[in-house]
């Protein structure tokens, strides 16, 4: 038997990445008290364009796929803490309050599939099929608070037991929103054939009852809060 691939594609990818990071920490000491404030921030953005061309042997069709998107990631983490020594190292209290935020965004992902029209000889001869736009926004918030207490019992030089106690609390919240829209190319008055330039397909001028119908394609997991 001779194995045959299911598909054979060649991809051309253009990618641009920008990053921004910041770190800010400080501490303050006075007497038996020490305070610390720690901060971390990161921002990452990626713009990408993919052009795929090849053959799908399942359908025995030559296809093209075009995808344009931007993704953004934001991360912040901050902590404020304190340590307090009381009564000549007999009692000690420390506490920490923290907050963290993370988000992921895809403000406008565009996807276009094209199929070769074997009966059309002039260029362009790929006709657009199933364009789609996708939006998503994910946000995570978390806050925490911890406190510890330590007491040393001065019984003798050979025996000095220590009592420790503490509390910890945490709160987390997540929201996710996503929307996807499909384009029904049922009307006329626009060019369905394109050669890697799909700006006309997504143009607002082409969205009408007699040209391109824009419909939302919902899913059960598109939006949730936890």
Q: What is the role of each PLM region?
A:
Residues 2-10, 49-66, 111-131:
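Solvent-exposed loop segments that connect transmembrane elements
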């Amino acid at each position: 038997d001779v194995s045959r691939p299911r598909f054979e594609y060649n991809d051309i990818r253009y990618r641009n990445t920008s990053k921004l990071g910041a770190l800010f920490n400080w501490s303050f000491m006075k007497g038996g008290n020490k305070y610390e404030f720690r901060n971390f921030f990161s921002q990452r953005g990626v713009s990408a364009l993919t052009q795929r061309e090849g053959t799908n042997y399942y359908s025995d069709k030559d296809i093209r796929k075009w995808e344009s998107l931007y993704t953004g990631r934001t991360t912040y983490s901050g902590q404020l803490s304190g340590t307090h020594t009381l009564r000549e190292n007999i009692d000690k209290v420390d506490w920490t309050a923290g907050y963290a935020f993370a988000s992921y965004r895809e403000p406008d992902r565009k996807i276009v599939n094209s199929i070769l029209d074997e009966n059309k000889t002039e260029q362009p001869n790929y006709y657009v099929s199933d364009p789609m736009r996708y939006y998503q926004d994910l946000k995570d918030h978390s806050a925490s608070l911890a406190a510890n207490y330590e007491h040393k019992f001065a019984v003798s030089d050979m025996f000095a037991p220590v009592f420790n106690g503490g509390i910890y609390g945490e709160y987390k919240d997540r929201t996710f929103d996503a929307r996807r829209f499909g384009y029904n190319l049922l009307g006329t008055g626009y060019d369905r054939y394109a050669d890697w330039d799909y700006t006309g397909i997504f143009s607002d001028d082409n969205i009408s009852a007699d040209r391109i119908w824009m419909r939302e394609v919902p899913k059960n997991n598109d939006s949730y809060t936890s």
